[in-house]
Amino acid sequence: MKKEILEVFDNTFPGRDYTIEIVNPEFTSVCPITALPDFGTIIIRYIPDKSCVELKSLKYYFLEFRNAGIFYENITNTILDDLTSVLQPREMTVITQWKARGGITETVSVTWPQKQ
């Protein structure tokens, strides 16, 4: 995915811890095994430091996954890695909730920094 698409703007309250939650209920990708579409919800929660992610750029970043054959776990970790490298937040959690396939749903979550 092209993390260069992601744009940021200055956090005007860097001295205060507050949480930003972003939800994308229409995320799509492709199963790398079956080539069938996968549908999910992406939830991003973060405490910004010096910058915040600009939402239009995030939308276009998400569209990069639309035709990519990629596993749920890889999507979740890639989003976290890309956003933390661009934003350098104080804390971030990415949760992906996937629609049922064969009657089974999956939720994947990852947090940065990792708890010791």
From Swiss-Prot:
Protein name according to UniProt: NADPH-dependent 7-cyano-7-deazaguanine reductase
Class of enzymatic activity (EC top level): oxidoreductase
Molecular function via GO: preQ1 synthase activity
GO cellular component, one term: cytoplasm
Catalytic function, reaction form: 7-aminomethyl-7-carbaguanine + 2 NADP(+) = 7-cyano-7-deazaguanine + 2 NADPH + 3 H(+)
Function comment: Catalyzes the NADPH-dependent reduction of 7-cyano-7-deazaguanine (preQ0) to 7-aminomethyl-7-deazaguanine (preQ1).
Localization per Swiss-Prot or TrEMBL: Cytoplasm
Keywords of the record: Cytoplasm, NADP, Oxidoreductase, Queuosine biosynthesis
Gene3D superfamilies per UniProt: 3.30.1130.10
GO biological process: queuosine biosynthetic process; tRNA modification
Source species: Chlorobium phaeobacteroides (strain DSM 266 / SMG 266 / 2430)
Family (UniProt): Belongs to the GTP cyclohydrolase I family. QueF type 1 subfamily.
Residues annotated as binding substrate: 53-55, 72-73
Catalytic center residues: 31 (thioimide intermediate), 38 (proton donor)
Pathway: tRNA modification; tRNA-queuosine biosynthesis
Listed EC numbers: 1.7.1.13
Gene responsible for this protein: queF
Highest rank taxon of the organism: Bacteria
